[in-house]
Amino acid sequence: MHFDRMKINVESMKQAILERVYCGVVQTPQSASTRDIFTAVAKTVSEWMAKGWLKTQSSYYDNDVKRVYYISMEFLLGRSLKSNLLNLGLLDLVNEALSDLGYDFDQLVEMEHDAGLGNGGLGRLAACFLDSMATLGIPAYGYGLRYDYGIFDQQIENGYQVESPDEWLRYGNPWEICRGEYLYPVHFYGKVKHSMDSRGRDVAELVDSQEVLAMAYDVPVPGFNNDTVNSLRLWQAQSRHGFEFSYFNHGNYIRAIEDIALASNITRVLYPNDSISEGQELRLKQEYFLVSATIQDILRRYTKTHLSLDKLSEKVSVQLNDTHPALGIAEMMHILVDREELDWDVAWDTTTKIFNYTNHTILPEALERWSLDLFSKVLPRHLEIIYEINARWLKKVSQKYPGDDDKRRALSIIEEGSSKFINMANLAVIGTSKVNGVSSFHSQLIKNTLFKDFVEFFPDKFINVTNGITPRRWLALSNKRLSALLNRSIGTDYLTNLTHLNKVISLAEDSGFREEWHKIKIQNKEDLSARIYKELGVSVNPQSIFDCHIKRIHEYKRQLMNILRVIYFYNEIRNGSTEIVPTTVIFGGKAAPGYAMAKLIIKLINNVAHIVNNDPKAKDLLKVVFWPNYRVSLAEAIIPATDLSEQISTAGMEASGTGNMKFALNGALTIGTMDGANIEMAEHIGKEHMFIFGLLEEEISALRNEYYPQGICNANPKIQEILDMVLQARLPEEDKDLFKPIVNRLLNEGDPFFVLADLESYLDAHNRVARLFTQPEEWTKKSIYNVGGIGFFSSDRSITDYASNIWNVSQSS
C-alpha cells in the first residue's frame, strides 16, 4: 500500500485514531460514544487508503490502460471496516491499538450497518468480484446506485414478514466521498423530434423531457496486500429544479418539494414492488438512470486522454451483470449516433465490442421484458434505437434463414402478440461480444434452451465463467479460528491462491488435526448458540446438527421442501421414534414484497418453529429458527458454525449459487441437488463427501408434461400426512385455511418446482446425514475434504477467467 507498514506501530496507530476523535468527530476520548470511535477509526482507515487510491487512479491514466466497468443493480458489500483493515494488513494492529485505548474492537464493528446496496447472490457476487479485481490489480470500476433505503429491513410479526425502510445511511457512510463535480443529466419521457442536417443526415432530438441529475459517490475498494485501490461509483438521483421557493411562499408546501421527491424516488429503494404499474415504471427508470450516468462517465474518462473515439473499444470493456443494465447498449448507441454523430455501423461495431453480458437465470419471471407501451412512454428515443437495432438484426436473420418466420420470432428483440414486449435478454445477446453463464451446467443449459437459436448464429459468443467467492471475507474474516489453524498447518498462500487448500487433504487422516478441526466447529457453534438465545430467545444445543438454509426466499430454492421435511421428523418425534439425531434447523432470507407465496412460506416456517420449539417432546431433539433480516454480516456468523448446508433448488433452476461455496469453504457438508455449481463442487470435492439427492434436470424435463403430484400422495401416505399437518400448522386464532394455498400449489397447481417429486429422496438423504453425524470422526474427515476441494471456487479464479477470455485485460498482481 502507499504507506510504509514498517513505520506504523501500535503507538502511531493510537495517535492517528485519537487525532480523528478530536478533529474528525470533535469529541474527547471520554465523551466519545462507541459510534464516534467507529467513525474515527473508519476515517483513519480512509485516510490511509487515500494516497493509494489517488496513486492507483493516476497510474491508470499514465499507462493508458484498458479499463473494465462492472455495472450492476446490486453490490451486497456487507460491512467494510474489518475487510478494509485485512486487505491493508492492519487488522491486528488496529485491534491492539484500540484495546490499549480501552475500546472493544468487536463492539465498534457492530456499529457499522451493512451497506444497503443489494439483496441476494447477484449483489454478493458483484462485491466478491470487486475485491478480486482490486486484489489482482485489474483496472476496474464498479457502477451501481446509491439506494437511500436498500431493499428493506425484514421484521417478523406474528410469523409474517413485515418490511420497513433499511436506514443504513442514518448515521452517514464513512467510506463514501461525494463527487459533486460529476453530475450528469438523465432524460425521461418527452417526444422525439426528427430533422435533416446539412449533410442530409437524420438528426433525432428528445424534447419536452424530464431531466434528473445523477450525483456520483465513490467508495474505495482496496486489494489484498497490494498497492491497488479501485473505485465503486454509486449514483444518487437529484432534482434539476430542487426546492421551489415560489410555491412554498404561496403555501403550496407539497408542490414546493414535489420535484425533489419524484427525482429522489429513483434511488430510494432497490427493486420497488413491480406487481403494480407504478413500480414497473420506477424500475425501468432506475435501470436507465444507472446506465445513462455510467456511460456518460465512461466516455468522460476516455475522452480525457483521447481526442477521437477510434480506440474506445480497445480501452473500454463493460460487463453487464444480468439484464438490468442491458439498456446500456441502447444508451451507448444513442450517445455515439445522436451526440457524437458516428455512422450507425461504426457505432454498432464499437458498442458490440465493448459490452459483455452475464446471464444469471433461465427463470421466465427473472428475464426482463418491458411492455412497449411503458417503454415508449419513458424512453421514446431508445425505443426507436432498439427498433433500428432489431430491424438490422432481423435482416441478417432472414439472410441466414430465408422464409423462416419462427426463427425471426425467436431471435427478435421485440415480442409480437396482443401485447408487445421488449426482450432485454435478446438485446443483451445481440449487442455484446461475449455471453457467459455462471457454472458449467448453467452455461450448457442456456445454450441448449434459452439461447439455443442464438448459439446457432453466434457459436463462439457463449462461454462459461463459474462463479467464485473471496476467501478473504468468507474465511479469513468470518472464521478466525479455522483460518488460524490453516495458517499454522499449510501456510497463508491460500488467501490469494485458493487451490493451496488442497494441502489440507493429507491432514484428514491425522487424528490430532481432526480433533482440532472438530473443536473449532463446536466453538463456532457455541458462539452462534449464544447469539441465537440472546437475539431470538431460542435455546439450541451446540452438539446438535446445525442445518442451515439461508438465502433469498423463492419457491425454486425450495425452503418449502425443507420445512415439509422438518414437519415429517417432528411427526416421527411425536410418534416416539428413538432414531432422531438432535438437529437445529436455521432459516434466513427475505421474500420480495409482492411475492405472496414466498411470504406465506415464511409464515409456515415460523408457525412450525413456534409449535416445535414449544413441544416438550421435541425439546432435546429438534429446534427451528427463522432468523429475521438475513444479511452479509449475519451470514458471516452463521456459516462458520454450520454442519449441513442446504442447496436444494429444483434441478435446472439455480444458475450457480455461491452460498454453497461459502459453506464448503468453512467445512460444512452439502445436501443438495445436481444443480448449478453443486455439480462442479461434486467433481472437485467428491460426490462421496456430499449428500446428493433428487431428480436430474433432464428427468424433470421429461416428467414435466405428465407430472401428477396427487399420485405421489396417493402412493405415499407419509407425504399425505405431512400435507395434512401443513393445514394444521395454523395457530388457534388463525384462519383454518391459512396454509391451503400452499397445499393447493403442490396438489392442484402442478407443483411447478417438483417439491413432492423430490421429497422422498430428500428425506432419505437426511437419514444419511443423521447416520454420518453419529460418527464424528468420519464427519470431520469429510469436512476437511470439503475445504480441501473447494479451491477452484475462488472469485480470484473467476476474475482471471473474465480478464483472459472476455475483457482482454492484464492483471498487475
From Swiss-Prot:
Job of this protein: Phosphorylase is an important allosteric enzyme in carbohydrate metabolism. Enzymes from different sources differ in their regulatory mechanisms and in their natural substrates. However, all known phosphorylases share catalytic and structural properties.
The entry's keywords: Allosteric enzyme, Carbohydrate metabolism, Glycogen metabolism, Glycosyltransferase, Pyridoxal phosphate, Transferase
Enzyme Commission code(s) on record: 2.4.1.1
Sample GO molecular function, one term: pyridoxal phosphate binding
PANTHER family in the cross-refs: GLYCOGEN PHOSPHORYLASE, GLYCOGEN PHOSPHORYLASE, LIVER FORM
CC terms in the record's Gene Ontology section: cytoplasm
Gene3D superfamilies: Glycogen Phosphorylase B (3.40.50.2000)
The UniProt record lists the keyword Transferase: yes
Organism: Chlamydia muridarum (strain MoPn / Nigg)
Pfam family, one: Phosphorylase
Protein name: Glycogen phosphorylase
Keyword Glycosyltransferase: yes
Catalysed reactions, semicolon-separated: [(1->4)-alpha-D-glucosyl](n) + phosphate = [(1->4)-alpha-D-glucosyl](n-1) + alpha-D-glucose 1-phosphate
BP terms from Gene Ontology: glycogen catabolic process
